[in-house]
């Protein structure tokens, strides 16, 4: 069985060789298995997407020699996409700062890469709704998420402004409602199960 003699990356500028190597399973000295090379190609692509390089493409080739097989990954990074700003509209009772703390999408800045990931938007929407529910706003919903992008030529990257449009709805509180129809538990027992006191927020 031929072994891998060397692994080479070509075309990468934004992500260093060491970090790329940490994200692949093959290494010099391993028996060459083409399916592992393809798996690693996918891992490298996932790494680029995670860092905001949505259009990165990666291909591979291998060269046989007496020493074994040299695996070459050809990388076309494309422009990165970062979040320049996160905005909220329709939020009255919850501040922008609080909502920003609840979502995984972060604005680019010092110590923050601000990588834009489309898949994070759905999770962010749910995180916002979940927070509103803990505050008793059980009708809260995200009406829309706007994504305005533009190319920053100076920084050679695409920048996105994300706007979450929120409909908060009414707040529900528990005002000592009498529970009827229960024959097994006392009302007091049910209320303790619900962990709700008079005036407490209902969610």
Features from the language model and the residues they span:
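Interaction-mediating elements
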Residues: 1-203
């Amino acid at each position: 069985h031929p072994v891998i003699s060397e692994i080479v990356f070509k075309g990468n500028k934004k992500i260093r060789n060491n970090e790329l190597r940490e994200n692949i399973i093959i290494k010099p000295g391993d028996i060459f298995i083409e399916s592992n090379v393809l798996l690693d190609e996918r891992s490298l692509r996932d790494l680029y997407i995670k860092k905001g390089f949505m259009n990165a493409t990666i291909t591979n080739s291998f060269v046989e020699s007496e020493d074994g097989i040299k695996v070459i990954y050809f990388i076309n990074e494309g422009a990165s996409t970062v979040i320049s700003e996160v905005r909220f509209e329709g939020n009255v009772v919850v501040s922008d700062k609080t909502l920003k703390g609840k979502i995984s999408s972060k604005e680019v800045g010092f110590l923050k890469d601000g990588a834009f990931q489309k898949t994070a938007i759905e999770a962010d929407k749910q995180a916002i709704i979940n927070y509103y529910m803990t505050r008793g706003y059980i009708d809260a919903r995200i009406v829309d998420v706007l994504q305005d992008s533009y190319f920053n030529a100076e920084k050679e990257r695409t920048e996105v402004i994300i706007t979450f449009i929120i409909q908060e709805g009414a707040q529900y509180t528990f005002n000592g409602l009498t529970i009827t129809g229960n024959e097994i538990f006392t009302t007091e027992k049910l209320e303790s199960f619900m962990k709700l006191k008079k005036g407490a927020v209902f969610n």
